[in-house]
């Protein structure tokens, strides 16, 4: 069963911050699509969440280096992103 929204996630994810829920949702659904069992998908999703957050007395907090591990980008986003520098742009004067 795929989750369609963070509102559909299991009760075990309620204490997560919104972005933690997004991480769980993405990894759970991707794992299910790869034909893993719900139990395995849950374990994979929690592993992804725990790369970015830790639980301290019931509160989920981001690691100081949490942005070093980007778990929310997709391959489509990575391949479609391009950057242009000033040196790469052509003006009509250059032609």
From Swiss-Prot:
Chain residue ranges for the region called Disordered: 65-95
InterPro entries in the cross-refs: ChaB (IPR009317), ChaB_sf (IPR037205)
Xref: Pfam families: ChaB (PF06150)
Domain of life, per lineage: Viruses
Protein name: Uncharacterized 10.9 kDa protein in LEF8-FP intergenic region
Species of origin: Lymantria dispar multicapsid nuclear polyhedrosis virus
